[in-house]
Swiss-Prot record:
Orthologs of this gene seem to exist only in pathogenic strains of E.coli but not in the K12 strain. InterPro entries: Aldolase_TIM, ModD, NadC/ModD, Nicotinate_pribotase-like_C, Quinolinate_PRibosylTase_N_sf, Quinolinate_PRibosylTrfase_C, Quinolinate_PRibosylTrfase_N. The lineage of its organism: Bacteria, Pseudomonadati, Pseudomonadota, Gammaproteobacteria, Enterobacterales. This is Putative pyrophosphorylase ModD. It comes from Escherichia coli O6:H1 (strain CFT073 / ATCC 700928 / UPEC). Pfam families: QRPTase_C, QRPTase_N. Its EC number is 2.4.2.-. Keywords: Glycosyltransferase, Transferase. Belongs to the NadC/ModD family.
Length: 284
């Protein structure tokens, strides 16, 4: 489970409600008891539920019912129902709706990608990068895990990943073996992941025996050719495809023999459509 502190929950609320709801205050309806319900209009893999519930309870509302993160919801299915005074209900309305719509959009997009991949490779995986929309990293991580994806890198201190921009600063930027050996000496507990931008670089990298080789923006044909020769050059190396991988392009790579894909596309998916209904207690 990804942990969000109370301060982070408060920040999600404060973006919208720091001054309260003027309309509710002017109508003098804030003291009335009522319910709020969130419905997913189109169906799909949901996330952001636990965060949404924490936001609602922070406002003093009581959760009556909620689905679980990662659930496959039907079109029109209720995701959350909470109760409390109308002032708190209206304060939570849009802030929570925004979290749910963005989170569910991310998780459902990734779930669709995984379903497509696993029709071809049941053991296939998709890892999502740290290139999330600024300020959304923790929500994004929750959504990725809810959909069944992997977190590629939570931060640059978590894993070793040798890019061309690192090699540019080396005395010999084509000395893959030297770079990989140095990384192994100085980070002996970590797997060594490297990225190649061309087939020539990929072959040179494989000869240096990395643990994982990322192929960046390779065509399906180039990826297939590398996948065919990799077992003889580096039998213990895992291949991954990255760069431009999304729901539309993924199908072009399903025959190349690579089972791990790296993407940031889900973060930019269309938000889910969440319907919100607020009603006084007497009408429920």
């Amino acid at each position: 489970m990804i942990f969000l502190s109370q301060a982070q929950i408060d920040a999600l609320l404060l973006e919208d409600i720091q001054g309260g709801d003027l309309t509710t205050r002017a109508l003098n309806i804030g003291h009335q008891h009522g319910y709020i319900e969130f419905f997913l209009r189109q169906g799909g893999c949901v996330s952001g539920i636990s965060v949404a519930c924490k936001m609602l309870t922070t406002l003093g509302l009581t959760i009556d019912d909620a689905v679980s993160d990662g659930s496959q919801a039907n079109a029109g299915q209720r995701l959350i129902r909470a109760q409390g005074n109308a002032a708190a209900l209206h304060q939570g309305w849009k802030a929570v709706q925004n979290v749910l719509e963005w989170s569910c959009g991310v998780s459902d997009y990734l779930a669709q990608m995984l379903a497509l991949l696993r029709e071809r490779y049941p053991d296939g995986n998709i890892a999502c990068t740290r290139k999330a929309i600024p300020g959304t990293r923790l929500l994004a991580s929750q959504a990725i895990l809810a959909a069944g994806g992997l977190i590629h890198r939570a931060g640059c201190a978590e894993t070793i990943l040798l890019f061309a921009n690192h090699r540019h600063f080396l005395h010999d930027n084509q000395d893959w073996s030297g770079a990989i050996n140095q990384l192994r000496r100085h980070a002996p507990e970590k797997k060594i992941v490297v990225e190649a931008d061309t087939p020539k670089e990929a072959i040179a990298a494989l000869r240096a025996q990395p643990d994982v080789l990322q192929l960046d923006k390779f065509s399906p044909q180039q990826a297939t050719e590398i996948a065919q020769i990799a077992p003889s050059l580096a039998p213990h190396c895992t291949l991954a495809l990255t760069g431009g991988i999304n729901l539309t392009t993924l199908k072009n790579y399903l025959d190349c023999g690579i089972r791990l894909f790296i993407t940031s596309a889900p973060y930019y998916a269309a938000p889910a459509d969440i319907k919100v209904s607020l009603q006084p207690a007497a009408s429920i």
